[in-house]
């Protein structure tokens, strides 16, 4: 089974569970994880904005709430330029429902990430690549 087939199988079986939580609840489903891109830095957002995002995410699911800053995609300005002008990328604002679900999943993952025993390779812009084997 290829990785893509495995992900499709997991997503079709556990479609309501973010894959990070599926790994925690069902550690036998994954042999390893590669985590790319940092989690949303909730500390940089005011408590009022977080509350508003949660409220909007439950009341007005399709309300536009914010855009991804292209400079956060890469440090390489050539890649940022390509991202900005790629016609296949949706550059519209993020919907409140999606943002709310990402915040919920992020908070859950932050609480349990140290308890996940699956080997993982983590990479983020702020850190060097590190391999966590538990």
Swiss-Prot record:
Belongs to the poxviridae K5 protein family. Transmembrane segments: none annotated. InterPro entries: AB_hydrolase_fold, Hydrolase_4. Pfam families: Hydrolase_4 (PF12146). This is Protein K5. It comes from the Viruses.
């Amino acid at each position: 089974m290829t990785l893509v087939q495995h992900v499709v199988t997991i997503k079709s079986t556990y479609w309501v569970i973010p894959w990070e939580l599926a790994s925690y609840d069902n550690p036998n489903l994954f042999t390893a994880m590669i985590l790319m891109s940092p989690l949303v830095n909730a500390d940089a957002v005011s408590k009022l904005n977080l509350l508003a995002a949660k409220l909007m995410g439950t009341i007005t699911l399709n309300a536009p709430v914010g855009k991804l800053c292209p400079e956060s995609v890469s440090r390489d300005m050539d890649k940022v330029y390509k991202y900005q002008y790629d016609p296949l990328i949706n550059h519209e604002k993020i919907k409140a429902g999606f943002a709310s679900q990402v915040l919920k999943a992020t908070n859950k993952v932050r609480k349990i990430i140290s308890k996940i025993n699956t080997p993982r390779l983590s990479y983020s812009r702020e850190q060097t690549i590190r391999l966590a084997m538990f």
